[in-house]
């Protein structure tokens, strides 16, 4: 445990907040994309599909790197039990709050919008359970994964800490090229695991809880650990905050490969396995792209930025049902995809900000949506 706080990483706070807020244009553009979602526009837009695919290809990989970075930073600052308790509360309480207040009403709304209310009694017990697992966890899945990663990382972080205490500080002798190879192999390993599961017991891949708890956690754990290593080794972090032409070009090529796989791949063949390899290495390269841009443009203290950093989790939690409401009841009345997309941004962001300001004035809601007890002020701690 260290009593000396690490310097404030303003650019990482900002990047994490903007990555979370990117969920708003991501889901609104999903309405107007060629991808089948809960609600879709009458005619899809190719450029909004492209925009949607780009966000989806890297956003959460970078997010989990930052989460791992802050998690290890706080691991060194607090006793183990206190660290685990605070970390789980910060993500677990908002997740459990959002299920009855947000995703359950969202599920009921979709049942009526998609005219599935009459079919519900005909479903088997497992089908009802699995439907509820997908629909109630919904966009909260990353909070569940963070709870799991926090618990799993206890042993890993303890080992890291012991190595730091017993070994002399030394540079992380690994280049971005070596990291790229490692993440490529990790992508292949993940793809192999998925293919084996697909061959042995394909039905389990459609199980919501298995997908969230096992498959998502397996995919994102390398990025979470990479974030912790970036905190341990400043030279490794410097590799990410220093612009790399190779990473930029690699990310561009990987995104083209991602689009081609989306266009020509088949779910019954190797599309998902190929995607896991592509997004694993693209996620690594985009860490460099995003970190280097953020370090140059966002590494400063600003009251406005701090406001959105603090508001980002709440806004993300409430934006999803607002987006679905917009898609179901307002999108059909707007013929232009561009105007509809812009109106969606204004509608969702505007209402989300109003709700955020209201919840700040109600201590119980403020606690439930932040996981922070009202008697404690730990504004320096990170949420994920």
From Swiss-Prot:
Keywords (A to Z) from UniProt: Acyltransferase, Cell membrane, Membrane, Transferase, Transmembrane, Transmembrane helix
Alphabetized GO MF terms: acyltransferase activity, transferring groups other than amino-acyl groups; transferase activity, transferring one-carbon groups
Topology within the bilayer: Multi-pass membrane protein
EC number: 2.1.-.-
Keyword Transmembrane: yes
GO biological process: glucan biosynthetic process
The protein's annotated pathway: Glycan metabolism; osmoregulated periplasmic glucan (OPG) biosynthesis
Pfam families attached to this UniProt entry: Acyl_transf_3
GO cellular component, one term: plasma membrane
Predominant place of localization: membrane
Subcellular location: Cell membrane
Keyword Acyltransferase: yes
Family: Belongs to the acyltransferase 3 family. OpgC subfamily.
Protein name as annotated: Glucans biosynthesis protein C
């Amino acid at each position: 445990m260290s009593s000396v706080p690490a310097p404030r990483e303003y650019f990482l706070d900002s990047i994490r907040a903007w990555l979370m807020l990117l969920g708003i244009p991501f889901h609104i553009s999903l309405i107007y994309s060629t991808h089948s979602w809960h609600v879709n526009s009458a005619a899809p837009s190719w450029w909004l599909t492209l925009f949607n695919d780009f966000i989806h290809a890297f956003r959460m990989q970078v997010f989990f790197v930052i989460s791992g970075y802050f998690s290890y930073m706080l691991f060194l600052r607090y006793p183990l039990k206190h660290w685990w308790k605070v970390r789980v509360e910060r993500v677990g309480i908002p997740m459990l709050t959002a299920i009855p207040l947000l995703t359950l009403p969202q599920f009921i709304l979709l049942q009526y919008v998609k005219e599935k209310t009459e079919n519900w009694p005909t479903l088997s017990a497992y089908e009802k359970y699995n439907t509820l697992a997908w629909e109630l966890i919904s966009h909260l899945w990353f909070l569940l994964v963070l709870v799991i990663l926090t618990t799993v990382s206890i042993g890993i972080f303890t080992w890291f800490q012991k190595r730091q205490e017993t070994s002399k500080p030394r540079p992380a002798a690994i280049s971005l090229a070596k990291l790229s190879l490692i993440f490529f192999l990790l992508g292949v390993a993940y793809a192999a695991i998925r293919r084996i599961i697909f061959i042995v017991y394909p039905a389990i891949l459609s199980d919501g809880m298995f997908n969230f708890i096992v498959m998502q956690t397996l995919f994102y754990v390398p990025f979470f650990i990479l974030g912790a290593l970036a905190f341990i080794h400043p030279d490794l972090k410097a590799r990410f905050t220093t612009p790399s032409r190779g990473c930029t070009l690699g990310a561009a090529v990987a995104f083209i490969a991602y689009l081609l796989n989306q266009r020509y791949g088949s779910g019954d063949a190797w599309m998902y396995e190929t995607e896991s390899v592509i997004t694993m290495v693209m996620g690594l390269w985009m860490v460099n792209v995003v970190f280097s841009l953020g370090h140059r443009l966002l590494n400063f203290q600003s009251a406005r930025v701090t406001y959105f950093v603090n508001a980002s989790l709440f806004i993300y939690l409430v934006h999803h049902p607002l987006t679905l409401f917009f898609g179901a009841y307002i999108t059909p009345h707007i013929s232009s995809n561009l105007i509809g997309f812009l109106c969606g941004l204004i509608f969702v962001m505007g209402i989300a900000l109003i709700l955020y300001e209201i919840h700040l004035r109600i201590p119980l809601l403020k606690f439930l949506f932040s996981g922070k007890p009202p008697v404690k002020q730990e504004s320096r701690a990170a949420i994920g």
